[in-house]
Swiss-Prot record:
Subunit composition and interactions: Component of the RNA degradosome, a multiprotein complex involved in RNA processing and mRNA degradation.
Cellular component GO terms held in the UniProt record: cell surface; extracellular region; phosphopyruvate hydratase complex
Cofactors required: Mg(2+)
Name of the featured protein: Enolase
Enzyme class, spelled out: lyase
Pathway: Carbohydrate degradation; glycolysis; pyruvate from D-glyceraldehyde 3-phosphate: step 4/5
EC numbers, comma separated: 4.2.1.11
InterPro entries associated with the record: Enolase (IPR000941), Enolase-like_C_sf (IPR036849), Enolase-like_N (IPR029017), Enolase_C (IPR020810), Enolase_CS (IPR020809), Enolase_N (IPR020811)
Source superkingdom: Bacteria
A Pfam family hit: Enolase_C
Amino acid sequence: MAKISRIIGREILDSRGNPTVEADVYLESGAMGRAAAPSGASTGSREALELRDGDKSRYLGKGVTKAVAAINDTISPALLGKDALAQADIDGIMIDLDGTENKETLGANAILAVSLAVAKAAAAEKGVALYEHIADLNGTSGQYSMPVPMMNIINGGEHADNNVDIQEFMVQPVGAKSFKEALRMGAEIFHALKKVLSAKGLNTAVGDEGGFAPNLSSNAEALAVIVEAVENAGYKMNEDITLALDCAASEFYKEGKYVLSGEDKSFDSEAFGDYLADLSAQYPIVSIEDGLDESDWDGWASLTKKIGDKVQLVGDDLFVTNTKILKRGIDNGIGNSILIKFNQIGSLTETLNAIKMAKDAGFTAVISHRSGETEDATIADLAVGTAAGQIKTGSLCRSDRVAKYNQLLRIEEALGDAATYKGRSEIKGQ
């Protein structure tokens, strides 16, 4: 038994300069784990609650002293003496302590930080890497795979101050033979894209996730400049590199219409599905996340019938890493993939349950960061330990993004031949 001896919560800053919650968990043996909760910008309405103070005189109301107090005053006394190796029990105690469906009493940010710190302390107690401990918890011991990265190199929507409506334009180095090679390919394309944008007189400042945020005439132009950059970097579209979108469509869904204000266009649900189908026919787009609003289930069903056999349709705001909502989606033929963000649900155990449910149903699971991140690289270990197959953790700059890529490099090196990089076959429909 690895008894918890001390838990400390504190307020730290995330990559956007906003406060977030960090937790330290100490065991009687001296083993220790530390983890921080991330924070999103475009959030699904059904996400677990991120507890903020609301005191406008401090951090513009975004302080997290209430969540920190929940750790120090409520969670800590309940977990002292408990076994850190029993992750499901630990998470269950915190969920019961909170007592609400969306974790609004203690805050998902408080519960998650402790949940992840407990897992890290348990890994330290066992003397194993975090991905190995996660694999043990997940029942996937020894079944490791290196994830195909979705690299967000052009930002729009809620992640940037520009006129591009689609939130993320991503490249996937599917033709790489290893994660190390995939990362190099992505970095070379990122630098090539900067040159392409500069040559066109476009802005090369970056958004929250490290991608460029230029003003472009259309979403199609964003795809065109990426294709140019890929080719300039010496790679072949659809062979070495495929494309992925995160529309974050709930952000531009207004009164039953999908409004692309940057292009001065408006679509009903069926027509916007056709728009996405056309884009994926013109370009090698093999994955579309949140292509429709989180409440537009009829539209999602139609889009899934339309292109779900050849394009990965990822539910983020749609499913919010929640098994109850995911089950409805599976039962009703909605999408074919889930985005996994552990702060949407608020504990490691519930996150693992969502990944398992998705995989058992033939869905893919894409492990994801949030736009507000820290140096915490737990999602890298989560992706490898669950053999999820895909990860989305931003562009090829900003330390909060690169921290995850660097951790994946270390894991691949440590695993050696056991680290398989399967490339294109990890993506649903490919």
